[in-house]
């Protein structure tokens, strides 16, 4: 992919973000207990090329409580349904630095709150008609 980065590609690029539409600097989504946050449905054909997120957990169990759910092309069963910890390669809910292609996790060390980091995934995830992405909270507290 990097060897063709300089070449023009056909297609439309889109991005979805949690930015605060009011203009305030509170660009985040809080997912209530037992609920899910849905990214607007992507219509295709297309490819999800990058997922980036960070979580402000009160406890380290947040990464086991929160599930990433992805369904392609209106499938009955999601193709991805996994705790964030497993998807981003830190087992037992222990947040650690990960530097592996295509997963990267960077902890915020120093004065940052504990259990906090930035998570990136660059798995290319193609779809023909649609892609639905949810972040589901299976805990008893908001995340």
For the regions a language model picked out, list residue spans one by one:
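Beta-strand-centric surfaces of beta-sandwich/beta-rich domains
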Residues: 1-143
């Amino acid at each position: 992919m990097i060897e063709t980065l300089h070449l023009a590609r056909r297609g439309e690029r889109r991005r979805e973000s949690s930015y605060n539409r009011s203009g305030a600097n509170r660009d985040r989504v809080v997912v209530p207990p037992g609920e899910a946050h849905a990214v607007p449905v992507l219509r295709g054909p297309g490819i999800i090329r990058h997922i980036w997120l960070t979580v402000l957990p009160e406890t380290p169990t947040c990464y086991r409580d929160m599930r990433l759910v992805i369904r392609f092309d209106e499938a009955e069963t999601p193709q991805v349904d996994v705790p964030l910890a497993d998807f981003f390669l830190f087992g037992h809910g222990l947040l650690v630095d990960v530097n592996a292609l295509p997963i990267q996790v960077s902890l915020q060390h120093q004065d940052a709150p504990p259990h906090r980091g930035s998570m990136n995934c660059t798995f290319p995830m193609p779809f023909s008609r649609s892609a639905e992405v949810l972040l589901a909270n299976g805990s008893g507290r908001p995340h």
